Each structure stands twice: as structure tokens, then as C-alpha cells.
A protein has these predicted regions:
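Rossmann-like dinucleotide-binding core of oxidoreductases
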Residues: 222, 234-293, 300-301, 424-445, ...
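Beta1-alpha1 glycine-rich phosphate/pyrophosphate-binding loop at the start
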Residues: 53-140, 201-205, 239, 249-284
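C-terminal, flexible cofactor-proximal segment of oxidoreductases
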Residues: 434-538
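FAD-site-proximal beta/loop scaffold in flavoenzymes
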Residues: 205-232, 319, 323, 350-433
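N-terminal chloroplast transit peptides
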Residues: 1-32
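FAD-binding core/adjacent interface of flavoenzyme oxidoreductases
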Residues: 17, 34-35, 47-55, 59, ...
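A Rossmann-like FAD-binding core segment of flavoenzymes
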Residues: 92, 133-167, 256-387, 393, ...
Length: 538
């Protein structure tokens, strides 16, 4: 625990908690409440001028790229650390968070946002709101290039740097560029849906499929679903491609939502699963809970196959739609999805109204070496870091989350014998934990203290099953899984705890409590109905 001017490495709590408040190997911080003030967050105003004033000239500048779980939580942890400004320790640095979006997205609750069970302000609050009680600055721009002040090339050809540098950022509206100076840099840009690489390319997918990875994707799906309500046809079909967590959760949420929504009760959902396999990384208990829920959804069918191509249907499109398969889709477009099954036979899904795409995520990084000087893993394209999350060869740059991969050196009698890259799961849980370590290590680097190796502690997995049901897989065995309404409540509480700020927790928690207090009998009836529904489905 950071408890004195002569700070030591964080204590390693031994008590495990599903909510993550105490974790083996997780740094424990004490908030710096002495210097807290209203943040100078701004989406438009230049901030570099402030950093050149005499007041701030000597302060270190920490720039965090990416405002997802890794980047935002790292910036908040840096702000909460104790910066004592005595005994040789450095004063609190200027922390700047840069992201191209105006809002943070709590991705595990995207499903509730899609089905209108939660509001946008609950799932996607603005950065300005989240940072208003911190000293973290926010700039809404896109990072396009990183220019270290100095780069040396070793005899082996490896690039190294021990200095700060500049990030070139671009305004999406004006296309104007600006240079942001950093002494220390954190890269946490997350993942994007890849439609174009040789590995993930599927003809027609980029033009006709809707990815499920961001706030705009959710809004586009809602718009298409509203349009589906108005379609007067006997058969309406929604395809969900991918049967990992995102695909299974999305399919179940849509199925349970459509069952009770007028105008959508006749929609059929097709879940396309490679080799017919569901939730490859889930436990036995988690897979069983998902299969049970999927099996009870009368409007949902699981299909074995991989998508080979998507084309505009020539016989099912409305009269307002062109039959040209290469043109952009409109709200009336019908699609044909061509599948290759595990036995190499073919199947075609005809006249599909909407195709939801949950596969093909890749690191969100520039591909040009001149724009992005860091070494990247050949297989995944992710930035290579050591165990402390420090980027290989760059003493003042750290990376975490979906855009990084750790490379471990196996040693025998003190000598490095081999290298092995360890890819952590691309989940919010990993980024949530890594943010603590990254913030601590930035503090340590600034104050010339030892860095702490990141050790991920798996705390189990949670998934929604739709309509106030969920499954929680505990990290104590393959069968230890809780599902149903109780798991739904536990999942809600866990995510409430993991909200980025206390203000956001209070905002959401008070709203849930207010809804219960306003109509307690309806709440009790809803719980009883959920339990009875779950019991009848078992």
C-alpha cells in the first residue's frame, strides 16, 4: 500500500474476490486527495499551450492513447496515486487522455443498451463527465503517428529509445493535425473489426454486415431492428456470425427481446458457429448454461458453418433497392449468406434482413513502421512488451490491452534461452487489471523505482443470457457455474463495481434503487416471474 513518503512497491493482497476489490498480485493504491480539482477536460480547446507555461514547464507529461478499459482506467489510477513531491519524488505529472470518441463505452453492457434495458448515459458516459473530478485532461482526436525524440538502432537492427517524444493527432472534423509532447506514453487503443486482411477477408462482409464493437454499431442495429418492425412479411431473418461470447450473448439477447416485442415475434435468428462449436474458451459449466438457454429459444437456430461470402439478394430485396450486389446496402436490403459447413458441404441463408458480425477482431494500430516505430508480433500484429508492460526497446513507452502482447524470456542459469509471446484474452477483465499495473509502473519509472511484472489473475467469466438471466463461471473448476436470475443480479453488481468512477457507480446504482422503491411490488413480481420462467426452462 502506498502509505508513506518513501513509497514501496504495492502490497500483494492474498484474499480473492470475484468483484476484484482484492486480488492476488494486484497493486493497491491510496488516492491522492490533496491536489484534486476540476479537470480541464475539453473536446476542442488546445491543451499544449498550457503545458508550456512556467507553472507546468517542469512537470512530466504522461500521454495515454485510447480511452477504453485499459487507457481510461490507467489514467484514472495515475490521477489517484500519491505524488508527494518530497524526498526526491516527482510531483504529479500532467496526464492527458486522447481518444477519437466523445464517450467511453462499457462494452460488457452493450447488450442491455441494444435491447433498451439500459440507457446510453449509463453504458456510454462522456469522458468529460467521467474526468470532471480529476486532473486528467481529455482531447478528442485520433493518434496517427508517434515520433520519439531519439531512436537508436542496435547492431542487430533493433530500435531503442530512452527519451520522450511527440504524438501527432488529427481532428476528425477539420482534419487538422497537432503535436502533443510526452515524457511517458501509454498505448491502449483496443481492437477493431478487421474486414480487409487476408486472414479475415470475406467478400461482402464489410459492405453488408454490421459489426458489434462500438456505440455506433449498436445504434445501427437498433435502427435496422426498428425497420424490421414495419416489414410485413411472413419470414424475417437475422443472422449472427460467430459463436464466441459476443455472438452467443448477442443472439440470446436478440432472441429473448424479439419474443416479447410486438412486430418482432416472427423474426428468426440464425447463429452461425464454425464447426458448430460454441464458446470455445468457456468452461464446461458455461457451455452447458449457454446451450440450455439457446435450446429453449424457439426463435433461434444454431448453424454449422463459416461464411464464405455475403451478397445482395436479387429476389428478396424491396423495389427500392438496387439488385447490384456491389452497391452499399440500405435499410431494405435482403442478403444471401453463403456458408461452408464442417463436412465441406454448402448452405445458403437466403433473404436475410440483417447480418450481425462478431468475429475478426484485431489490434487497432497503424500498419506503417514510419508511423508506428514499435516492434509488433508477426502473428498477431500487436505491440510487443515485456512482463512489466514496457514496450520492447522503449524505456518510456508502455502498452496494454488488446493492442499488446507480452514476450517472456525463458532463462536457464541466468541466460536467456528462448522467447515466448503470451497473448492474454481480449477481455475487459484483462485490461481492467493491467491498468493498475501500468499506472504503478509509470509512477515507478518516473520516480526511478523497480517496475512490477503484470500477472493476470483470472476471476471467472460472466455472460448475459437475455431477459434478466445470466451465467457466471467461477474460477474454481470446469463445472462451477451459476446461471439464471441470481447470476443476472451478481453480474449487474460486479459491473456496477467495475464502473470507472464512484460518481458513475452512484448514478447507476441510485437509478436501480429508485426504480425498485418507486414500484416495489412490480420488482417482486418481476423477480418471481424471472425465477418461474427460469425454472420452467430448466
Amino acid at each position: 500500500m502506498i502509505s508513506s513518503a518513501n513509497q514501496k512497491m504495492p502490497s500483494l493482497a492474498r484474499k480473492k474476490s470475484f468483484f476484484g476489490s482484492f486480488r492476488r498480485g494486484r497493486p493497491s493504491f491510496r488516492a491522492d486527495t490533496r491536489r484534486r480539482r476540476t479537470s480541464s477536460t475539453s473536446t476542442n480547446a488546445p491543451f499544449t499551450r498550457a503545458s508550456t507555461s512556467s507553472e507546468h514547464a517542469s512537470l512530466k507529461k504522461v500521454v495515454v492513447l485510447g480511452g477504453g478499459f485499459g487507457g481510461l482506467y490507467c489514467a484514472l489510477k495515475l490521477d489517484a496515486l500519491s505524488w508527494r513531491e518530497k524526498n526526491g519524488e516527482q510531483p504529479k505529472p500532467i496526464v492527458t487522455l486522447i481518444d477519437a470518441n466523445e464517450t467511453f463505452l462499457f462494452k460488457p453492457l452493450m447488450y442491455e443498451l441494444l435491447t433498451l434495458d439500459m440507457e446510453e448515459t449509463e453504458v456510454a458516459p462522456s469522458y468529460e463527465e467521467l474526468l470532471q473530478n480529476t486532473t486528467v485532461r481529455f482531447v478528442r482526436k485520433e493518434a496517427t503517428k508517434i515520433v520519439p525524440d531519439t531512436i537508436l538502432t542496435t547492431k542487430s537492427g533493433t530500435k531503442v529509445s530512452g527519451t520522450g517524444g511527440q504524438v501527432i493527432v488529427r481532428d476528425a472534423l477539420t482534419n487538422e493535425e497537432e503535436r502533443v509532447k510526452y515524457d511517458y506514453l501509454v498505448v491502449s487503443l483496443g481492437a477493431k473489426v478487421d474486414f480487409e486482411s487476408e486472414k479475415n477477408f470475406v467478400k461482402g462482409a464489410k459492405e453488408f454486415a454490421i459489426p458489434f464493437n462500438g456505440l455506433e454499431d449498436v445504434k445501427e442495429m437498433q435502427k435496422r431492428i426498428e425497420r424490421l418492425k414495419e416489414v410485413k412479411e411472413d419470414e424475417k431473418t437475422v443472422a449472427v456470425v460467430g459463436a464466441g461470447y459476443a455472438g452467443v450473448e448477442l443472439a440470446l439477447c436478440l432472441a429473448r427481446w424479439f419474443e416479447r416485442e410486438d412486430g418482432l415475434k416472427d423474426v428468426k435468428i440464425k447463429l452461425v458457429a464454425k464447426d458448430g462449436e460454441l464458446l470455445r474458451s468457456a468452461t464446461t459449466g458455461g457451455k452447458a448454461a449457454a446451450r440450455k438457454a439457446l435450446g429453449k429459444a424457439s426463435n433461434l437456430e444454431i448453424l454449422d458453418g463459416t461464411v464464405g461470402a455475403i451478397e445482395r439478394s436479387t429476389d428478396g430485396s424491396s423495389s427500392s433497392s438496387s439488385s447490384n450486389s456491389s452497391s452499399s446496402p440500405d435499410e431494405n436490403t435482403k442478403l444471401n449468406i453463403f456458408l461452408t459447413k464442417s463436412d465441406s458441404s454448402s448452405e445458403t441463408l437466403e433473404n436475410v434482413d440483417m447480418c450481425c458480425w462478431t468475429v475478426g477482431l484485431t489490434a487497432k494500430l497503424p500498419t506503417s513502421e514510419t508511423d508506428w516505430p514499435f516492434e509488433q508480433d508477426r502473428r498477431t500484429g500487436k505491440i510487443i512488451t515485456d512482463s512489466t508492460l514496457k514496450v520492447a526497446g522503449y524505456d518510456r513507452v508502455f502498452a496494454l490491452g488488446d493492442n499488446s502482447i507480452q514476450r517472456e524470456h525463458e532463462k536457464t542459469k541466468g541466460k536467456s534461452t528462448s522467447e515466448e509471446s503470451e497473448e492474454k484474452p481480449a477481455t475487459a477483465q484483462v485490461a481492467f487489471q493491467a491498468a493498475d499495473y501500468c499506472a504503478w509502473n509509470v509512477w515507478s519509472a518516473i520516480n526511478k523505482r523497480p517496475l512490477l511484472p503484470f500477472r493476470y489473475q483470472h476471476l471467472g467469466d460472466m455472460m448475459t443470457l437475455g431477459n434478466k438471466e445470466a451465467a457466471v463461471q467461477f474460477p474454481i473448476g470446469e463445472e462451477a457455474t451459476l446461471d439464471g436470475p441470481a447470476a443476472f443480479a451478481l453480474r449487474r453488481l460486479a459491473y456496477l463495481y467495475r464502473m470507472p468512477t464512484n460518481e458513475q457507480r452512484v448514478k447507476i446504482g441510485s437509478k436501480w434503487l429508485s426504480a425498485i422503491r418507486a414500484n416495489p411490488s412490480a420488482f417482486v413480481e418481476e423477480v418471481i416471474e424471472g425465477v418461474n420462467s427460469y425454472t420452467s426452462r430448466k
